[in-house]
A protein has these predicted regions:
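A glycine-/polar-enriched beta->alpha junction
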Residues: 32-42, 49-64, 90-108, 118-125, ...
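Heptad-repeat amphipathic alpha-helical coiled-coil interaction surface used
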Residues: 43, 48-50, 55-57, 106-108, ...
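Bacterial Sec-pathway N-terminal export signals of envelope proteins
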Residues: 19-67, 170-172, 212-257
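Heptad-repeat register of long alpha-helical coiled-coils used for dimerization/oligomerization
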Residues: 24, 28-31, 38, 96, ...
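Periplasmic alpha-helical coiled-coil/stalk elements that build and connect Gram-negative outer-membrane
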Residues: 126-241
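Sec-dependent N-terminal signal peptides
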Residues: 4-13
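Small/polar, glycine/serine/threonine/aspartate-rich low-complexity segments that form flexible
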Residues: 21-23, 69-96, 105, 221-231, ...
């Protein structure tokens, strides 16, 4: 008796430990796991970071550039020998105007950045939607399997009853066969639903990267899709909602605006550019070089550049 109680206690503890290792995972945690695990979300995020860098690069054109260069020059002359000079040059350049090229490039980068953000949110929504759909499919197939099992238990009890009735001569053998056919049909349905459940479980594990059991997924019975869905009857209101919330539409608009700014930048490049340039040169002559021939100098000027021909690049 003591040995029997020991085995029962051990089995109960083992079962409790196993149950504690398989907690029910909320839908929110499954969605977060999928957003972390799916490569498409990561790729979309890094594309957003790239577009942010492109925007910073476009904005950097608004700032002046400061350069420091050093060079060693050798000049051999027959009369005086070899002249050497170490030249240190600091130059400051600032583009005063380019007639809208930089502004158009910045606006283009902003539209592309907004596009990447919208695509990132769209990717997360797609992944979340797939997780939610799979989540409720798993719950649905579990309930269908449970219903089939309950019905099978009912027919099995009926089969036992008919066995007694046939033995006593009250019922016929054909009645028992009908019950057995019903049980076989339920077994077939159970196998089919189990296969569907396995497919959905594999899909959930592939999306989340988690090793899950069907018992860990239980839907909220209070969830009602049609109570939360907003039915829109007005075509104008529906179109307004599409223009405001639809990711594909917003991306299409931003792509068109970015292309327009690209065209504006190409048209503006037909105009000249005006730059303010300042430089300071420090010379350090040596050898047979004279200091008077290599004096330090400071220059300030305005450069106007106009492109005459670049192989039809702007028109292309």
């Amino acid at each position: 008796m003591k040995i029997k109680m020991f085995f029962l206690t051990t089995a109960f503890i083992t079962q409790s430990t196993y149950a504690s290792e398989l907690p029910v995972i909320p839908l929110r945690d499954l969605v977060n796991a999928a957003l972390t695990h799916q490569p498409s979300v990561a790729v979309s995020y890094y594309e957003t970071e790239k577009k942010n860098s492109d925007l910073d690069l476009s904005r950097a054109a608004l700032y002046p550039t400061l350069d420091l260069t050093s060079g060693l020059n050798n000049n051999r002359k027959e009369s005086s020998g070899t002249e050497r000079n170490v030249e240190n040059k600091v130059s400051l350049s600032y583009r005063i105007t380019d007639f809208g090229v930089r502004g158009a490039n910045i606006r283009k980068s902003e539209y592309e950045r907004d596009n990447s953000k919208t695509d990132y949110e769209k990717t997360k929504n797609i992944v979340s939607q797939e997780v939610v759909t799979t989540y409720y499919n798993i719950s649905k197939y579990r309930e269908m399997i449970d219903g089939v099992n309950l019905e099978k238990e009912f027919y099995k009890k009926m089969l036992e009853t008919f066995s007694l009735l046939v033995s006593s001569g009250v019922a016929m053998q054909s009645d028992m066969r009908k019950v057995q056919v019903s049980i076989d049909a339920l077994n077939t349905r159970s196998i089919m639903y189990q296969s569907m459940l396995d497919d959905e479980m594999y899909k959930m594990q592939n999306m989340t990267g988690l090793n899950l059991s069907p018992d860990q997924i239980q839907s909220d019975e209070k969830f009602n899709l049609f109570k939360k869905y907003i039915f829109v009857e007005s075509p104008e209101k529906l179109m307004d909602m599409v223009m405001k919330y639809n990711d594909d539409y917003k991306m299409l608009v931003n792509t068109r605006k970015a292309a327009t700014e690209d065209i504006n930048a190409a048209k503006s490049s037909y105009f000249p550019t005006v730059d303010l340039v300042s430089s300071y040169v420090q010379n350090n002559p040596s050898g047979s070089a004279k200091k008077s021939d290599y004096e330090d100098e400071f220059k300030t000027g305005i450069n106007v550049s106009f492109n005459i021909f670049n192989g039809f690049r702007n028109s292309a």
